[in-house]
Each structure stands twice: as structure tokens, then as C-alpha cells.
């Protein structure tokens, strides 16, 4: 699929029906959860919450039950902010409804679900800015954490658990993915140590994969490529073989 105008698509994922879903941001983007059709057109699925435009949908994950969780921060964009919060939302494709899933994450970024479908991992990457500033903040307040939320039977989230706190000095996590054992692969953007950091489901650091430039996202291939980790960093796309195959929530697991 090629799109000359992707509507500022960021996070992408293909559902069980083979449709590509996208989180479309601001800065002349669509500001919505959308489907990218086979001819590259952006087809909005949901554009508002309680009648107000989303800030700038950033990343998404499809739960095995079909729910779409997507993050809605604002890093760039000249459009006025209509919502007074930056949250994780859950879209239900059966009822065609959208629900606010979090109220205790100040600026959510990457999002991924555990292989058993019981936990939602959310990267909190708060640079203290709204995206409307004309000049960079001199002393931004940063909140950089990796969080785990239990997923209830109705798709709502339970109490947040902070798995890792990266302090308030450098940038934290962007996109994430998981392997079939539930380990989390996070695109870590700290200037002093950027690359892919692998965490256990409990938040223990297991491995570090340096990248040539600041990474933005990562995902595993499928089929024969299931153990290959693909990484976007700077203007490049990189790959590295891994010992454990990746997990895709919307696809069946190869056994």
C-alpha cells in the first residue's frame, strides 16, 4: 500500500480481516483513527470523543477480541486543542463506540497488548509541551514511564502499575512491540542511550539493542520472518534476528 497523503499516519496495524488501521496525527493530518484502503486512501473510522476532535492519535494496538486501543497525545500541530486531556482510547468495532481508557497518563505514546490479552502496556512520554508552542520550552517538565494496565472483561482498564520510571531528564519510549513470551521491545529515545530496550513483563531490563539513530518504532515480521525484529530509526529501516518469535495480537500464533 502506498499513500501520497497518509493524513499524518503514525502507528499502523493490520486487523484479522486484512485491513490496515492507522493512528493519524495533527499538523494538517486527519486527527483520527482510520483505515488505509488498498488504493492508499485514508478512511476515517472515528474522529471525535464526546463531540471534540482528537489531539493527534499516535499509536495503536488491536486486542485479540478486536478492540482498538490508541494513544492521543499532541507533540506537533497548529490545530487548536479541543480536548482538555491526553489519553488512551478504546474503539469497539462491534458497537462503533469509543471509550476513554485512561485518566492517569499525562501524555501516552506507544501502546501494545500482552500475548494473553490480559495486560495493556502504555509508554508515558511527556515532554511538557502541548505542541502549540512557538518556541521550545526552556525547562520542560518530563514524565517518562512504562506502565501496565490489567484489561478487564469489558475492555476497560484496571489500576495502573509503573513498570519502569526513566526520570525527568531525557526522552523515554516511542513505539513498542512484544514477543510470544510477553517480553516488551521498546524504542528508547534517550540521547545518552538510544536503541531498542527489551523488558520482561515485570519491567526488568533484559537486553539493549543500539541503533544508528533515534528509533521511533519496532515490530516483528510474520511467517518465516516471525523472529526478525524490524526497527524504524531516523530515515532508515533496520532488521535484526531474535531468538523468540514476535507476537501480533490480530494474527494467529504460529506453533
Model feature map: region roles:
Residues 35-98:
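Hydrophobic alpha-helical segments and helix pairs
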Residues 24, 77-82, 132-140:
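Short consensus segments that form the blades of beta-propeller domains
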Residues 217-255:
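Blade-level signature of beta-propeller repeat domains, shared across WD40, Kelch, NHL, RCC1
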Residues 139, 148-156, 241-248:
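Short loop/turn segments immediately following beta-strands, especially the blade-tip
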Residues 1-5, 39-51, 87-107, 150-169, ...:
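Blade-edge beta-strand/turn elements of extracellular beta-propeller
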Residues 31-34, 86-89, 145-147, 195-197, ...:
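A short loop-to-beta-strand structural motif that recurs across blades of beta-propeller domains
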Residues 5-24, 30, 50-68, 85-87, ...:
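Beta-rich, blade/repeat-based domains predominating
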